[in-house]
Amino acid sequence: MDGSADPFLLALNFAALALPTLIISGPAGVRTDRVGCERVLVQSQWALLAAAGLGALAIPLFDGMAQVILLLSSTLLVGIAGAYELTARNKYCSILVGPKQLGSYLTSFSVVFNVGKLVGPPIGGWLLAATGPTWALGIDAASYLLPIASVMFFLRPDSTREIRSTNGKNAGLTNAWRECGPTLQGVLTLTAVLCLVGFFHPGLAPLIAFEVLGGKPTDLGLFTSVLAAGSIAGGLVLQRNSAQFSYRPFLTLGGFGVITAIAQLGMSRSPGVAFSLAMAFLIGAGTAGLLSSCNLITQIGSDQVMRGRMAGLSQIAFLGGGGLSGLLVAAVVVSSNLSTAFALCGGISLVVALRWIATRCKATLAPIRSA
């Protein structure tokens, strides 16, 4: 990790993973609803394996600019395949469990994902030190075989509950947006705005860690682990209160937005390392709660026939917004500094979140309409 790393290069790497959702998530959702979530899920997991394998091959076979291009291409392909995987997995959950368990089951994925983020950096660092980059990336690629085997051989979904869309104009993403209703439209809009303003820490984590902790590789691991620990905490809170939180969607989303905004403002005036790590914990909790809440609310509040497309719209809101956020904040960092970027984003996010809470906090989500 080098403090002189170009913020735009860091943001571009995350954008390569996140921005494909703006283009791919819509078609991914449409395909999931048309051909079936299990089929798309397996296909996307094989694609993830191939894309990650491409990155593993880049290290021993290429060097210089060719290696950089191949690694960025691998990241881009992982982002594309991941958009299909996440879309299909969300709808797949609804045929694995019943309606009463769906909310808790969906939010459990956030917890599991963030546990992976907590233990992943130290495991990845150990693999890198013990085996080198080629084997480390190769093992990472091979890890995709486990979920493939789970879906193909171990999980037993009730496929009779899945409702597929038919070909035609009513099966598109635009139709899902119109039919989901004003509450879910508002949920997607608020999530997109908050992510566009403040979801930049995944891409700029190396730069933030350098400013807060220092330039040692272990400092980045510590920073990302604290973020992940906060994300786990936010996910657990949402999981244990999924019914109550989803009933008041704008109060929930706005509340998580306020937590993130206050933490970002704290980062802009951090008096020390301990305080900065505490703020990083809150940023992890707030953003995880926001993203998981959006996913939860749009799934349980929509009909089974459009849940693939709603998952696609959710991805566009938070990953598309996040990919753009990193690039915008990188421009602020280059023109001023990181503290200014935190202050600006935290202030805007706080105003946006409080305004939505003030105007729509009483809005409620209709009960689950289908299994």
Predicted feature residues:
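Helix-loop junctions at membrane interfaces in 12-TM secondary transporters
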Residues: L57-S74, G266-M279
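Small-residue hotspots at the loop-to-helix junctions and early N-terminal turns
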Residues: S4-A11, T107, P217-T224, G312
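C-terminal transmembrane helical hairpin of 12-TM major facilitator-type secondary transporters
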Residues: P249-C294
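Structural signature of the two symmetry-related core transmembrane helices
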Residues: V40-A56, A141, F250-L265, A343-G347
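A single, central transmembrane helix in multi-pass transporters
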Residues: T131-G138, N175-V237, S339
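Substrate-agnostic recognition of the 12-TM MFS/MFS-like secondary transporter fold
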Residues: F14-T32, C37-L48, L70-A129, L194-P202, ...
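Flexible cytoplasmic inter-helical loops of multi-pass small-molecule transporters
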Residues: M152-N175, L365-S370
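Hydrophobic alpha-helical transmembrane segments
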Residues: M65-G79, S104-E162, S225-V226, L328-V329, ...
